[in-house]
Amino acid sequence: MEIEKEFHRLDQAASWAAIYQDIRHEASDFPCKVAKHPRNKNRNRYRDVSPFDHSRIKLNQGDNDYINASLIKMEEAQRSYILTQGPLPNTCGHFWEMVWEQKSRGVVMLNRVMEKGSIKCAQYWPRKEEKEMFFEDTNLKLTLISEDIKSYYTVRQLELENLTTQETREILHFHYTTWPDFGVPESPASFLNFLFKVRESGSLNPEYGPVVVHCSAGIGRSGTFCLVDTCLLLMDKRKDPSSVDVKQVLLEMRKYRMGLIQTADQLRFSYLAVIEGAKFIMGDASVQEQWKELSNEDLDPPPEHTPPPPRPPKRTSEMHNGRMHEHAEFFPKHQVVEEEIRCSVSTAEETVSDGRVFSSVPLITDSTSQDTEIRRRTVGENLHVTAHKEESKSESVEEDDENMMTTWKPFLVNICMFTFLTAGAYLCYRVCFH
């Protein structure tokens, strides 16, 4: 197959970075005037990722129709996608308004809410414990009906209700939970297993509106997902599947949203996934079952937040009764206070892998004066306890010094007496015999 030959050629020549740069230089560039308008600044997660004016999704409610989302229409493949950023706290209502107005049935989420200590997306769907969310700005209600958790993805059944018309719709939420930012999935098999789950649900069918796909910025992981799906569709539709040119398909998609595919590794992975997926297109139905087995989807999922391993205890030495003793210090001084203070501080800045830092709208957290007072009191008590420990330690050292003096005192007295008697005898000898 031609795409496989091209992949091996690029691999052998180590040309992925070069071809990725070529795509960046050849990509379309269109105006983004609406996105850059000052009143829309707080609706953009990143200041350098904006929808083109000609392909942006427009909201129908309210006096501002802007949302950072783009409609990508792949005519030959007969597939449309809405690529958007991870919702901000102030745009969650706009997100679900878009889903409602565009008649979308599926939402594909390719990131976690929190990644490497940074907030990548607001919690825009209800958790198990709360079940429901209300969006007063758009008069919508979202209910969690069911949740199927696999090792690396979760499928949620949601019910979206328009409180104005009392109409309800089923929404399927496909959440890929182990795809790292600026990275690639574990394997083409796991990715294709996920893609075909989305396909089999009917969420991509033409009788529904475009599927909504997002990650954090809505260009890297989202672009990879849509590129692979489109290439496989084209291979299935064309008489000559090998005629599909991945690079040209990506350049076509970039006419609708900037920056799709963020790294050379994501481009390389897209080729790998298309090559593997082509086996199914060419008639090998058994590969789909192989993808499922290789993906290990039935294993336990990783924890949402993996805590760092504990630090080894600090070794300290001290003198006691004239001997040196070592002991492990499991609770270093002020550790409790520092942890308490650290927990009360948060940041809304997000850092991407090329070193840029973008400020997003800060998350709104509920806090009361009572909580603040408790935190202050806890810190004060910890400081008092620490000071008391320091005082006790000082007294203990003084007691040790006194004990040492008591132990050595008889010995020192004997030495002094012996020295005095010897000196006296010597003086008597000098006087009497000389």
Swiss-Prot record:
Residues 291-319 are annotated as: Disordered. It catalyses: O-phospho-L-tyrosyl-[protein] + H2O = L-tyrosyl-[protein] + phosphate. Its EC number is 3.1.3.48. The active site is at 215 (phosphocysteine intermediate). The modification Phosphoserine is found at residue 50. PROSITE patterns: TYR_PHOSPHATASE_1, TYR_PHOSPHATASE_2, TYR_PHOSPHATASE_PTP. The keyword Phosphoprotein applies. Substrate binds at residues 181, 215-221, 262. InterPro entries: NR_tyrosine_phosphatase, Prot-tyrosine_phosphatase-like, PTP_cat, Ptpn1/Ptpn2, Tyr_Pase_AS, Tyr_Pase_cat, Tyr_Pase_dom. It is a peripheral membrane protein. It holds the Pfam family Y_phosphatase. Phosphorylated on serine and threonine residues near the N-terminus by casein kinase II (CK2). One of its GO terms (cellular component) is cytoplasm. Keywords: Endoplasmic reticulum, Hydrolase, Membrane, Phosphoprotein, Protein phosphatase. Interacts with EPHA3 (phosphorylated); dephosphorylates EPHA3 and may regulate its trafficking and function. Interacts with MET. Interacts with NCK1. May play an important role in CKII- and p60c-src-induced signal transduction cascades. May regulate the EFNA5-EPHA3 signaling pathway which modulates cell reorganization and cell-cell repulsion. May also regulate the hepatocyte growth factor receptor signaling pathway through dephosphorylation of MET. This is Tyrosine-protein phosphatase non-receptor type 1. It comes from Gallus gallus (Chicken). The gene is PTPN1.
